[in-house]
């Protein structure tokens, strides 16, 4: 059996289905399956007999979805980002509220040698932690709330200034 896989981010399964509807309709001899896990859509292409069929469908799918494809193998987005950052000698720090450290934890979980890129992870769940650890101004928190673009920006800026990382990820949001 010949097969191929694409891992996509930033697009829903419904949108992938719509974009590829004509490919699904004309895929005799080729099995194309979609699986959505959170923000990730996996596209698997299998054929019993012809490598050309898989290659043709793979090329068509890649052409249409290349802005969303982060890997052509079965890896997590954390692994793909880690590889790119390592290749480009970039470092990362996180400022996490809603995710409570999960982003940095996933980089460590999925990547042996994560310390090559991950400098630090800050969990700043309370307003006090945001002010104390990341220098988020109290005025910004009071005026715009902890769950705002302005606060997230100041979290990222504070993390960038304090960590010296090349790239910072900041998260905030409503827990429920």
Language-model region placement:
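Short beta-strand-to-loop capping motifs
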Residues: 8-10, 43-49
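Conserved beta-strand core positions
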Residues: 30, 41-43, 167
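Short, solvent-exposed polar/charged micro-motifs at secondary-structure junctions
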Residues: 15-16, 42-45, 103-105
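Accessory alpha-helical/coil subdomains and C-terminal extensions
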Residues: 1-39
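Short loop/turn motifs enriched for small/polar and acidic residues
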Residues: 37, 46, 172-174
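Short alpha-helical segments enriched in small residues
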Residues: 23, 52-176
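Short, conserved charged micro-motifs
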Residues: 14-17, 49-57
């Amino acid at each position: 059996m010949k097969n191929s896989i694409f891992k996509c981010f930033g697009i829903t399964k419904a949108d992938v289905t719509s974009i590829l509807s004509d490919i699904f309709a004309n895929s005799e001899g080729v099995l194309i399956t979609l699986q959505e896990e959170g923000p990730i859509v996996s596209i698997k292409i299998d054929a019993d007999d012809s490598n050309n069929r898989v290659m043709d469908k793979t090329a068509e799918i890649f052409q249409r979805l290349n802005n969303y494809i982060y890997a052509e193998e079965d890896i997590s987005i954390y692994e793909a980002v880690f590889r790119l950052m390592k290749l480009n000698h970039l470092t990362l720090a996180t400022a996490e509220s809603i995710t409570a450290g999960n982003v940095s934890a996933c980089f460590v979980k999925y990547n042996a040698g994560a310390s090559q890129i991950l400098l630090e992870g800050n969990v700043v769940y309370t307003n006090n932690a945001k002010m104390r650890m990341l220098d988020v101004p109290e005025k910004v928190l009071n005026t715009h709330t902890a769950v705002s673009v302005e606060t997230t920006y100041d979290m990222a800026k504070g993390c960038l200034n304090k960590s010296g990382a090349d790239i910072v990820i900041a998260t905030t949001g409503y827990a429920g």
